[in-house]
Amino acid sequence: MANVQVWTGAEIKALRTAMRLSIREFAAHLGVSERMISKWEAKGSDITPLPVNQAILDTALRMSDPDTKARFKGLTGGAEISGAETIEPIGSSQVRHPMTGSPMVKVDGSIYQAGPSNTPLWVPSYYIDIYLVSNADYAQFVAATGHEPPQHWENGTFPKELANHPVVWVTWKDAAAYAKWAGKTLPTAQQWEKAARGTRGATYPWGDQPTPAKCNVRENGVGATTVVDCYQSGTSPYGVYDMCGNVWEWLDTQSTPGRRELKGGAWTSQFDRAVPSQFNDANETMCDDDTGFRCAAPAEDLERLLHGTE
């Protein structure tokens, strides 16, 4: 399927045509006004919708049936759209964790370009969560263990509209406790960075072009977390979401006693803070409305579980 790196009015019209919808029907499908659709289509490739609408369009294409996707591919030439930069996805196996059911992707052992200076560094094989741990995911842990829920959950229950948003208001110890319960770990700084940048040391998950529209950062004006599968065009070479923006992510790597590294930036962060090679850390007891996590697992350990061997 053609992957739209940056939507313009031209691709929007192609999607509506592929879906065989009128302007009124298409506007209702996206949850925007008819006037907005007409404006986008009239201006064609000269207009780029706001990041929140880019995400809506990504989702509309992703959720379309195969016939619609095929028609869209034909209308757009089947190539990367809008001349935007992209990097080749890395073929790797995806699995569902046997305990939590969360989708994880394998990152094969290899050298990658680490840190701001792109230092070659070997990292053994591991799996990493494709998505951030959501409120719904974390609720299973709270229910199973009696662990204290995040402070913004009313009466110990997360707001229903935030079910698929990343869990926040968690300390490093909260995140580590979840990972242990799930039979996983928190990723190290090296594991996280490799999953974000690929083996060739791209500046961002999608390549070297600074494109804030591909992630949830302050410049986009979203002003809150977004669902964990929102920014498809901003995924990493391994297909991992939200490696730039949405929430800062706790990592296993200790910077100094009592402090742990975080990466990825957040909806509260300026875009330049979301660069995956950048360093950030915080006290293990820190928690905020822009800090969450995802999990990882050593390849051998997870594959033993998957194959039912000890």
Regions found by a protein language model. Give the residues of each.
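DNA major-groove recognition helix of helix-turn-helix/homeodomain DNA-binding modules
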Residues: P49-A70
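Recognition helix of helix-turn-helix/homeodomain-like DNA-binding domains
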Residues: G31-P49
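A short, Lys/Arg-rich alpha-helix, primarily the initiator
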Residues: M1-M19, A55-D58
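A short glycine-rich, aromatic-capped structural motif
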Residues: V95-H152, W169-K173, A195, G245, ...
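Functional-site microenvironments in short loops/helix caps that host divalent-cation chemistry
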Residues: V105-V107, Q113, E148, E154-D289, ...
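Short, structured beta-strand segments at or near domain termini in extracellular proteins/domains
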Residues: D289-L305
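Conserved hydrophobic/aromatic packing and binding residues within compact polymer-binding modules
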Residues: I12, F26-A27, I37-W40
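Short, charged recognition helix plus adjacent turn
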Residues: T68-S93
